[in-house]
Structures are given as C-alpha cells and as structure tokens.
Amino acid sequence: MTITLTENKRKSMEKLSVDGVISALAFDQRGALKRMMAQHQTKEPTVEQIEELKSLVSEELTPFASSILLDPEYGLPASRVRSEEAGLLLAYEKTGYDATTTSRLPDCLDVWSAKRIKEAGAEAVKFLLYYDIDGDQDVNEQKKAYIERIGSECRAEDIPFYLEILTYDEKIADNASPEFAKVKAHKVNEAMKVFSKERFGVDVLKVEVPVNMKFVEGFADGEVLFTKEEAAQAFRDQEASTDLPYIYLSAGVSAKLFQDTLVFAAESGAKFNGVLCGRATWAGSVKVYIEEGPQAAREWLRTEGFKNIDELNKVLDKTASPWTEKM
C-alpha cells in the first residue's frame, strides 16, 4: 500500500531527510539529560547549562544530520543555531511519566500545540507514547483517543506527525531484564500495528528495534536468549507490521552496538527509513561539558561526536531505505 502525502507534508518530509533517508539527531531529552548532568556535578543543572549544551550539539553536529529533534522547553535556542540545511522536529510531550502508577498516561506540554510548533519553525510534530499492548484496556483506549487528537491537530495544520512508541509491560519493572527481552518483539510489533491505522494520522513511526540485542547470539556478553535467526524473524515481523515509514531510536545504547544493530536489521529484511539517534551520538559530551566547560565540549563534538555521526551516516547509506518508496 502506498500512502499519499499532501504537498506541504511532502515538502516537510523532504526537508527532514536526505534522499529519502531520515538521519536525524535526537536531543529532546530533558529529565534524562538532567540526570546525566547531575552525575558530574553536585548542584542541580541550570536552564542555562541545558540550553547551552543543546545549542553546542546543534551547532556542531547538524551540518552532518538531515534534521534535529529538540524540545520547546530548552531547545529553542539550539533550533536557531542549527545548520540551514537541517530540518527541525519539536517534541510535544511532557518529559517522563508518573512512576506511582503503571498507566504512564501521555500529556502534552501546557503552552504548546501543533499550531505553535509549526509557528516555531518545525517541519514536524513528534510525540512520545508509552504503550503496553497487553496492559489495561481502559488505559489503552485513553491513549488511543489521545493520539487521535494529536493526529487531527497535525492534519489540520498540515504538518507531519512522528509518533515515538516506547513499549513496556505493566508487570515487569525492568525493560533491560531477560524477562522483558522475551516479550519485546511482541510488544513493539503489535503496538506498531495499532498506530499504523489511518485514524491516528501518523506519518512516521519512531520505534525501538524489536529485540534486545544484548541477548542475541554473537552480540551477547552473557546470557543468550535468541539465536540470530530468531532475532532476524523479529525484524521481518516488524517490517510486516506497518506500511508507514519507520525509523529507529538508539535507546541509549553505545554507538557501536546501534550501528551493528542497523546492519543486522537490514540484513534481516527490515526496510527501515532512518534513525533518530540521540545519546549514542552525543552522550560523551555531557561529562566533558560539566567538568571542562563549553569549549572542551565543542572540541569533543568536533572529534568524537563527529566520528559517531559520520560512522552512523556511513552505516545508514548501506542499510536504510528511502521513505519515498512508501509514500
């Protein structure tokens, strides 16, 4: 099935990609970034620090990315120093979730809307949803209605809607556990089927790889839960789960593991359309910025950061498929 885009959405999608491949830099982290910064200093990270680091990353690395994902809370200064060639996605969700309940309900930023995100110069709206396909069905209905609203907003504003799905299990506390690894492919691929339906108005899915590669033979350091063929099947099932373009998030894994995973995904038959890669590219700059200052962080970004993004781009050239084949 080929999906039809409006002229405006197509122009926006072209601005966010290079030759149909989305090689985007993700730096919409807020809570996670504060926790990373707090590991290297005793005082609470300041707004100025967060804005400055985001701006440094944007300025130094967007010349090598097709686009950058930022948040409107701390990322607007960074959006203004990005490369002229790079597109902009803005996150619409509040950071984090209520840890006292298993429902992880979505919530939009209070003073933002799809209209305001478009007015801020973004080519797309990105929204993060936590979803457990096997979870409380009343909660899931609430989540579906919420995504329908955002889809309708984005249709009205004629702006692409990137939906990021992070899966979880209401009964498993640790997503890195072997227990969750055993159900991850089911969680990821079934959630993709749900939100690929036209009623949600999603243009691009930003998703996890369907396997925790740390438990796959040839990738695992310790316990092996999956053969390479079982892992490959999970990627094939993912490809079959949607007609929409989909891109991978790096989920905080190392640059090397993420790149190796993309090669494995492509060899398995996944026709993914790019990445929104965050920490795997810039994580090392946080410690340098806090301990040695902005100039040292800039130097790190020009060397290590560039190396990470350049290597990733080379892998994408070999592995990613253009979204234009689907739309």
Swiss-Prot record:
Instruction: Enumerate the GO terms in the molecular function aspect.
Output: 6-deoxy-6-sulfofructose-1-phosphate aldolase activity; tagatose-6-phosphate kinase activity; tagatose-bisphosphate aldolase activity
- The record lists its disulfide bonds as none
Catalyzed chemical reaction(s): D-tagatofuranose 1,6-bisphosphate = D-glyceraldehyde 3-phosphate + dihydroxyacetone phosphate
Query: SUPFAM superfamilies in the record, alphabetically?
Result: Aldolase (SSF51569)
Question: Sorted alphabetically, which InterPro entries does this protein's record hold?
Answer: Aldolase_TIM, DeoC/FbaB/LacD_aldolase, LacD_aldolase, Tag_1.6-dipho_adolase
Superkingdom of source: Bacteria
Q: Please state the pathway this protein functions in, per its UniProt record.
A: Carbohydrate metabolism; D-tagatose 6-phosphate degradation; D-glyceraldehyde 3-phosphate and glycerone phosphate from D-tagatose 6-phosphate: step 2/2
Do the record's keywords include Lyase?
A: yes
Which SMART domains would you find in this protein's record?
Answer: DeoC
Q: Which Gene3D superfamilies match?
A: Aldolase class I
Q: Which GO terms describe its biological process?
A: 6-sulfoquinovose(1-) catabolic process; D-tagatose 6-phosphate catabolic process; lactose catabolic process via tagatose-6-phosphate
User: What are the UniProt keywords, alphabetically?
Assistant: Lactose metabolism, Lyase
Which EC numbers does the record give? Answer: 4.1.2.40
* Family affiliation: Belongs to the aldolase LacD family.
Q: What is this protein called?
A: Tagatose 1,6-diphosphate aldolase 2
Tell me the organism.
Streptococcus pyogenes serotype M1
